């Protein structure tokens, strides 16, 4: 395994952690940068899954106190903790069902620069539309989300299976459309990411376990570490950002990047 491939793994791990929780599509960026730097890994899909796991574990670490409080509250009979836990599970199940049914089609047909470019542009336009509304949220705390809102976010999250859409972008915008404040939607998106991404990672690792060997573990480990570290900074920064700013800057980024991809890579 060459030093160049190891450096590329570090770089892609950084990109994963940087983009996973921003509404700009981490999968889309991994596809694009993987093409640009000509990254080759024998572990293939397993590499992507493990670096995504690094990013989600960063969220688990940052929200560890809230997670512990929720678990303790759930088993001690705290109604708010139980309500929020069931809300997350309700939002999680649509992705499970649709993901299992459509995963092979999505990966074989939709993983291309053209799909990423189109999804980036459409997603950017949707963000502009949502942010242009007279936005008066009915729910300002993530733990107060209603079951109806949670289910709506869950179904909208399924759109993120299309590369370039962005799981965080879909869930944040879905939350805002259903009445959550920008911050509440962002924090609910983080909590929903935990079962969604951990479940997807487990499923994909089981399917790709045969390609995990001692020869490619260095690349995987390097990508995991950089994804974890960069995600730590991004999650904290995003929560502070959405408290005072709209998501329009991400909409501009998506549209410009999508146009560049169409002209340069296609």
Curated annotation (Swiss-Prot):
EC main group: hydrolase
The cellular location(s) given in this protein's UniProt record come to:
Cell inner membrane
Answer whether the UniProt record assigns the keyword Manganese to this protein.
no
What family is it from? Belongs to the UppP family.
Q: Which organism is it from?
A: Acinetobacter baylyi (strain ATCC 33305 / BD413 / ADP1)
Instruction: Supply the PANTHER family for this chain.
Output: UNDECAPRENYL-DIPHOSPHATASE (PTHR30622:SF3)
Any GO BP: regulation of cell shape
What does the record list as coiled-coil region(s)? none
Q: What is this protein called?
A: Undecaprenyl-diphosphatase 3
InterPro entries per UniProt: UppP
**Additional info?**
Bacitracin is thought to be involved in the inhibition of peptidoglycan synthesis by sequestering undecaprenyl diphosphate, thereby reducing the pool of lipid carrier available.
């Amino acid at each position: 395994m060459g030093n160049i491939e190891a450096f590329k793994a570090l770089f892609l791990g950084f990109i994963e952690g940087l983009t996973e929780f921003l509404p700009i599509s981490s999968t889309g960026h991994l596809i694009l940068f993987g093409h640009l730097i000509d990254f080759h890994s024998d572990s293939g899909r397993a590499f992507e899954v493990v670096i995504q796991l690094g990013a989600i574990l960063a969220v688990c670490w940052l929200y560890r106190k809230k997670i512990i409080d929720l678990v303790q509250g759930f088993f001690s009979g705290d109604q708010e903790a139980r309500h929020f836990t069931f809300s997350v599970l309700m939002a999680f199940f649509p992705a499970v069902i649709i993901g299992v049914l459509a995963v092979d089609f999505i990966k074989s047909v939709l993983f291309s620069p053209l799909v990423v470019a189109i999804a980036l542009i459409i997603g950017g336009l949707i963000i502009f539309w949502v942010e242009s509304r007279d936005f008066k949220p009915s729910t300002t705390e993530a733990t107060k989300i209603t079951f109806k809102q949670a289910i709506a976010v869950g179904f909208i999250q399924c759109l993120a299976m299309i590369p370039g859409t962005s799981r965080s972008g879909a869930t944040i915008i879905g939350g805002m459309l259903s009445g959550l404040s920008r911050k509440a939607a962002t924090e609910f998106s983080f909590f929903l990411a935990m079962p969604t991404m951990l479940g997807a990672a487990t499923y994909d690792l089981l399917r790709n376990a045969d390609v995990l060997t001692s020869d490619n573990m260095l690349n995987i480990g390097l990508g995991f570490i950089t994804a974890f570290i960069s995600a730590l900074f991004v999650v904290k920064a995003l929560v502070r950002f959405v408290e005072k700013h709209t998501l329009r800057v991400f909409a501009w980024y998506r549209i410009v990047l999508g146009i560049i991809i169409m002209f340069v890579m296609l």
